[in-house]
Amino acid sequence: TATPMAHGSSWCNAPCKPTFFLGVLPVSICSLGADFLSSLCTQALIQFLSLPTSLLISAMYLLGQTKSIHISCPKENASSKFLAPYTTFSRIHAKSITCLDISSGGGLGVSSSTDGSMKIWQASNGELRRVLEGHVFDVNCCRFFPSGLVVLSGGMDAQLKIWSAEDASCVVTFKGHKGGILDTAIVERGKNVVSGSRDGTARLWDCGRSACLGVIADCGCSINGVAVGAADNSINLGSPEQTPSEREVGTESKMLLLAREDKKLQCVGLQSRQPVFLFIGSDAFNCCTFLSGFLLLAGTQDGNIYQLDVRNPRAPVQVIHRSGAPVLSLLSFRDGFIASQGDGSSFIVQQDLDYVIELTGADCDPVYKVATWEKQIYTCCRDGLVRRYQLSDL
């Protein structure tokens, strides 16, 4: 595994085995050839680390751009590619950044911080565009609607708000929760949204009328994460006991996934309100996401990432455990996923790649959230920085 230490560097360790330091540093090509410099730096790195011959290192130094280093150990069938940030935004917030999202067009970012602020900024350079003011206390979660012009946020004040990204006005406020809102999900184009709260309830809201359409689940414990996904035709979501409101739009054939504090992962039919499954994990569930119409991921406080098949949820498809640090964010990405943890690690797992992509830079500070747009990946961290990675640099 790798524990990020500083900009573009990591401590790499395995249980009961020697630890070594890996650095991805800026290099000036000057008059040296790129191939020669790459070979020279790789040889120096191997000598410095005194690594076993079974460990192969290849370094790629891109002219004026971010660098990456690929480390593999064929003997252990393990391989990772370490990617340094393309750029870092340090002036968006003054304190820890707890959530972020990128608009559908990739032009704007939105983030919330423990400094009490929520801001919209230019995704290309971090330049501030709007400050969204109206929540009391901290904002726990924020995300763009599919249009990219509207933002949904939830705060410790138990309020859910909708904002215009164009003029920073709050156009809708939802009230009904009795505890702080910890996560949200948007149903299709956004006429309905879902919220999960410390009060133990998950609620469905009508954006057009600023009204609650119903309590989807009452868990009796904090709901740390929520996700909405379209169900595969083979999954029985049950039938609603009452005729759904005409204000429900796009809830049919949708599943709602709830990551609960009491070590349970719950799935219900969004329209039917009927249970689909209840899975008990090793610790509190912090986050969850759908990979497909029947596959999902959920991360726990003790570092486990469960992959489940909704058609047979009793036994996990697999359990990924890289460290005991809390899994804080999971995001479906291409044919795999991106995860971030409380020890500063962020990584990408892809089915078509035989290596893991490690996103470096966070100095052991928790990486709270990951967002993507095309080949760009953004992370937010306790150190108050937004980091942007370019997958084209690999």
Model-identified regions with their sequence ranges:
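Intrinsically disordered, low-complexity acidic/Ser/Thr/Pro-rich linker and tail segments
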Residues: 1-99, 105-107, 230-246, 254
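Conserved strand-to-loop turn within each blade of WD40 beta-propeller repeats
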Residues: 112-115, 153-157, 196-199, 207, ...
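Blade-level signature of beta-propeller repeat domains, shared across WD40, Kelch, NHL, RCC1
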Residues: 367-394
